[in-house]
Structures are given as structure tokens and as C-alpha cells.
From Swiss-Prot:
The keyword Chloroplast applies. Part of the 50S ribosomal subunit. GO terms for biological process: mitochondrial translation. This is Large ribosomal subunit protein uL16c. Gene3D superfamilies: Ribosomal protein L10e/L16. One of its GO terms (cellular component) is mitochondrial large ribosomal subunit.
Amino acid sequence: MLSPKRVKFRKQHRGRMKGISTRGNQICSGKFAPQALEPAWITSRQIEAGRRAISRYARRGGKIWIRIFPDKPVTMRPAETRMGSGKGSPEFWVSVVKPNRILYEIGGVPEDIAKAAIRIAAYKMPIRTQFIILHL
């Protein structure tokens, strides 16, 4: 699973997801891609599940690029803990995804295989996505 090798600060504020993605919203390496339609946190486990689904369906053919990286730590407190005594410890990593963000890219496979692979990966995501094609 993806996670940063080292970070400057162990804990972060949760923040909020306003607006649409202005960066990472164009296909740059592959030919087909799923594009986010809603804002959400996507965990490193979900990213890995989607990557596995695409690579299994596409078999040996083609190449996959993961365009999002989980760089935000999410903290959780232990169950049945009293209030106070500081912020909880980091439990998992998420990627903050806004609408229009490209999640993965696929190249080197026919359109029908890419579309089916992306649909399987989209089921593993907590958001709605759309299938887009690079038109030159």
C-alpha cells in the first residue's frame, strides 16, 4: 500500500474539500482514465484495490499509472477512551480527491478492455467516476 516514506509532521488537520481540482485533471501518460465526479478521501487500501482490479483485468497487456497519492494522515482515538489527552495516533493515509481529478491512467489496451477494467476499479472507490478518453 502507498504511504509517504517520511513526513515533516505526523498529524494534520482534517481540512475541507472546496471547489474542483485544477491540477491533475488532464490525461498525461495513458489513453483512458477514470475521473472523479465527487469530493472524497480515498484511502491507500482503496487505491491499491483499484490498481489490482485494473491490472488483473488487463492481464499482461498495457500499463497503469496511479495519479493520486495518499499523503494525508488520518488519526483515530482508541475505542472507549475518555475525552482529552491529545489527538489520536495516525491510523491510515488518505488522498484528498476533488471533482475532475484523474485517479488512474491506462495505456496499451483496447478501449473495451480499458472501460471494463476501469468500471471494476470504480466499484472499489467511494465516489462516482466517469470514463474519459484522450483525444489528440
